[in-house]
């Protein structure tokens, strides 16, 4: 089984890249986000690989990190999610944002993925809520905020600050992560305006 490829970028197609490794061209399917991050043809690249072996074909899927590959595997444990949908999700949400979206039960963020409807998005956040934290780099502050929001225990300035960032166009996972960091920096008595200001600084990093 192939676990990693290191070689020169030969060419690109809509959903895959050809990597030249010692004169052999490997066709590797990647998410749109990964394809955009890879270098120009002729330059070197390294991808973590998931190998699928079927009776009639061998298919390679490539990822920029082992964490992204683990997400690819985990997503496919959800009913109705195959390799194509898993790649589409990872093309829409990077691993950290996907982890935060699941921690926040933010099915709307997942549903922004082309081809993923509300029902599949809900299954993803529901079925993975207990599995994802085992390896995902989920902000502990987001997890705490998730529980507090669900139980209506979040301080009002925190809830208002998250709402304000969402109204500015940020997704709920990004807004919650930024305000979680702002809350840690400012302390429990921080007011809404201060949290928004610090949250925007976090998002600008």
UniProtKB/Swiss-Prot annotation:
Comment, domains: Has three domains with a flexible linker between the domains II and III and assumes an 'L' shape. Domain III is highly mobile and contacts RuvB.
Gene Ontology BP terms: DNA recombination; DNA repair
Source organism (scientific name): Bradyrhizobium sp. (strain ORS 278)
Record NCBIfam families: ruvA
Ranges for region Domain III: 154-205
Function summary: The RuvA-RuvB-RuvC complex processes Holliday junction (HJ) DNA during genetic recombination and DNA repair, while the RuvA-RuvB complex plays an important role in the rescue of blocked DNA replication forks via replication fork reversal (RFR). RuvA specifically binds to HJ cruciform DNA, conferring on it an open structure. The RuvB hexamer acts as an ATP-dependent pump, pulling dsDNA into and through the RuvAB complex. HJ branch migration allows RuvC to scan DNA until it finds its consensus sequence, where it cleaves and resolves the cruciform DNA.
Compartments it resides in: Cytoplasm
Keyword Cytoplasm included in the entry's annotation: yes
One family name in Pfam for this protein: HHH_5
One term of GO molecular function: ATP binding
Name under which the protein is recorded: Holliday junction branch migration complex subunit RuvA
């Amino acid at each position: 089984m192939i676990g990693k490829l290191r070689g020169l970028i030969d060419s690109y197609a809509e959903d895959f890249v050809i990597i030249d490794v010692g004169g052999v061209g490997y066709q590797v399917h990647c998410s749109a986000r990964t394809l955009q991050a890879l270098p120009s043809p002729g330059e070197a690249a390294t991808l973590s690989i998931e190998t699928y072996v079927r009776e009639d074909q061998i298919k390679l899927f490539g990822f920029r990190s082992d964490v992204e590959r683990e997400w690819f595997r985990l997503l496919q444990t959800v009913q109705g999610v195959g390799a194509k949908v898993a790649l589409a999700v990872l093309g829409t949400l990077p691993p950290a944002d996907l982890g935060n979206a699941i921690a926040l039960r933010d099915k709307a963020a997942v549903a922004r993925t082309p081809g993923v409807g509300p029902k599949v998005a809900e299954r993803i956040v529901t079925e993975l809520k207990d599995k994802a934290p085992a390896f995902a780099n989920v902000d502990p502050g987001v997890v705490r905020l998730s529980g507090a929001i669900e139980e209506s225990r979040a301080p009002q300035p925190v809830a208002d600050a998250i709402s304000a960032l969402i109204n500015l166009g940020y997704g709920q996972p990004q807004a919650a992560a930024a305000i979680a960091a702002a809350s840690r920096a400012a302390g429990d008595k921080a007011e809404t305006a201060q949290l928004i200001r610090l949250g925007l600084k976090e998002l600008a990093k």
